[in-house]
């Protein structure tokens, strides 16, 4: 029995995703730049193809103003070089006019034939700082407009920021049906939780103790119930898996062995979400960790010394990592977004040791969003007018 009701209650499978380091976030030793691991198209697309080969069902393509890849351009480039893996595109609300964003995402969904998922984010733009309440109001309105564009014939919207009247939705019809691409969302403020509970599909969390994660899940679930909704829940976490726990712990220590604290701080500060509430919670993890950086027997916070955002890793043997994932699943977590350093090597480590022992799924398929044949949309099987 899960601790909260989840949308995919009937399935025992879990969506296991990897991470493509689009934002200058790949290292053999944290904080030590390696030009062979820069966020080039060649390197990042190889991570995607490797994840597909290893059986991962989705891959997060993040967004930030770093030397690297633009998210939506990168996802478009991945369409012809992949065939099975879903792509989870991080979209910072407000960067694009909402109706045009709906059309852009619909185009990508057609290119991927239903393999697009969307991570809604609300962080600041480069060189521009705005009030949190405004940013989440903007995201709330963008999400509502996306859902109108993907499910209705006409877009009519009157919000505090955006107003549209009688705009045809034909150009924005996606490949996926019954609601369009799934919306994944992470955030910790009351405005963020309210937005996710009312409009999104998967609530994403960064690593904390299981007790705190359970509290967060319950808080969001209560809000969703007020709208007669359920959600699925996801965990974004790094992972280090080896044959033995000792090997995994030794690798974790080696990963940060050349890290200068000043360099780590500068890496954290350059992220667009560096001052967010979620990042503050990750910093708190490091404050309460034991002398080796662990807040639970297999949850290590050392990664957060040189990374904004998700700042902890599961560390252990194959059996220990499997046990940790199973315990999260029993809580009600149905999506894992994993990563490790360097991303290509750790993708293969996890894939070869763990993936074959997991029952995995694609959440868009579980939700019935992906049609068996080309849908009757203006851009697919529908008649041209």
What are these language model-derived features?
Residues 1-82, 176-181:
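N-terminal beta1-alpha1-beta2 module of alpha/beta enzyme domains
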Residues 2-25, 132-176, 208-330, 359-385:
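An alpha-helical appendage that flanks or caps ligand/catalytic pockets
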Residues 14-20, 59-61, 86-91, 116-120, ...:
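Hydrophobic faces of well-ordered beta-strands that scaffold small-molecule active sites
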Residues 22, 26-42, 90-99, 174-188, ...:
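Active-site mouth loops of central-metabolism enzymes
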Residues 36-51, 71, 101-104, 185-195, ...:
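Short, acidic/polar
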Residues 58-77, 207-211, 338-351:
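Glycine-rich, proline-tolerant flexible connector loops at the mouths of alpha/beta enzymes
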Residues 69-89, 148-149, 225-227, 233, ...:
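Alpha-helix-loop-beta-strand connector modules within alpha/beta enzyme cores
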């Amino acid at each position: 029995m899960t601790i909260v009701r989840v949308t995919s209650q009937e399935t025992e499978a879990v969506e296991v995703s990897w991470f493509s380091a689009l934002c200058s976030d790949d290292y053999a030793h944290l904080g030590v730049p390696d030009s062979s691991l820069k966020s080039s198209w060649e390197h990042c697309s190889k991570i995607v193809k490797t994840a597909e080969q290893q059986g991962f069902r989705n891959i997060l393509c993040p967004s930030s103003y770093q030397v690297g890849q633009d998210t939506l351009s990168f996802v478009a480039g991945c369409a012809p070089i992949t065939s099975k893996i879903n792509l989870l595109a991080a979209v910072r609300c407000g960067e694009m006019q909402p109706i045009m964003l709906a059309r852009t995402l619909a185009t990508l969904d057609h290119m991927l034939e239903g393999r697009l998922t969307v991570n809604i984010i609300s962080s600041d733009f480069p060189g521009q700082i705005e009030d949190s309440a405004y940013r989440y109001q903007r995201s709330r309105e963008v999400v509502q407009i996306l859902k109108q564009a993907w499910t209705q014939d006409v877009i009519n919207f009157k919000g505090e920021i955006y107003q549209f009247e009688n705009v045809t939705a034909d150009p924005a019809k996606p490949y996926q049906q019954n609601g369009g691409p799934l919306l994944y969302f992470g955030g910790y403020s009351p405005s963020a939780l309210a937005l996710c509970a009312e409009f999104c599909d998967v609530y994403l969390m960064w690593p904390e103790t299981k007790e705190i994660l359970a509290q967060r899940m319950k808080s969001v679930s209560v809000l969703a119930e007020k709208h007669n909704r359920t959600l699925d829940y996801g965990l974004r976490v790094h992972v280090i898996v080896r044959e033995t726990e000792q090997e995994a712990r030794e690798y974790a220590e080696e990963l940060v062995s050349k890290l200068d604290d000043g360099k780590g701080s500068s890496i954290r500060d350059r992220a667009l979400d560096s001052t967010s509430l979620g990042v503050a919670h990750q910093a708190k993890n490091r404050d309460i960790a034991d002398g080796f950086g662990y807040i639970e027997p297999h949850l290590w916070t050392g990664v957060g010394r040189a990374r904004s955002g998700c700042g902890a890793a599961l560390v252990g043997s194959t059996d220990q990592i499997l046990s940790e994932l199973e315990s999260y699943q029993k809580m009600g977590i149905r999506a894992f977004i994993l990563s490790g350093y360097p991303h290509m090597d750790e993708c293969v480590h996890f894939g070869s040791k763990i993936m074959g022992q997991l029952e995995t799924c694609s959440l868009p398929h579980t939700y019935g969003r992906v049609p068996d044949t080309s849908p009757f949309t203006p851009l697919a099987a529908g008649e041209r007018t």
